[in-house]
Amino acid sequence: MAAKSAVNGLTKSLALEYGPSGITVNAVPPGFIDTPMLRKAEENGFLGDIEKTIAATPVRRIGKPEDIAAACAFLVSEEAGYITGQIFGVNGGRNT
């Protein structure tokens, strides 16, 4: 939790510092994302039962790398020019 709080604080501080220059700063903490690293951790018994994780996620699935990419693409677009200092969780609604 300390690292999470540090990233949140850094995001907000940088947004305040760079906002006057027209630079937005946001964070995108991911939920469980289906990557080779996640599957390897599952195979090695580091994650427990992935199906329980899916069941505890409101959208009932593991995220895809494309989910993270879509959020980042939005946040760097002109449409998100008024969004700064935010923690934009891409986690299927599962907040930990």
Where are these regions (language model features)?
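Conserved catalytic core of two-component sensor histidine kinases
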Residues: 4, 69
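Active-site helix of classical SDR
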Residues: 3, 11
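A glycine/serine/threonine-rich, flexible loop-to-helix segment
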Residues: 32-56
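Short C-terminal tail/terminal secondary-structure segment
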Residues: 73, 84-96
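Conserved SDR Rossmann-fold cofactor-binding beta-strand/turn motif
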Residues: 24-30, 34, 76, 89-91
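A conserved structural motif in NAD(P)-dependent oxidoreductases
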Residues: 57-68, 79
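Active-site loop of short-chain dehydrogenase/reductase
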Residues: 20-23, 86
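Alpha-helical segment proximal to the catalytic Tyr-Lys
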Residues: 16-20, 81
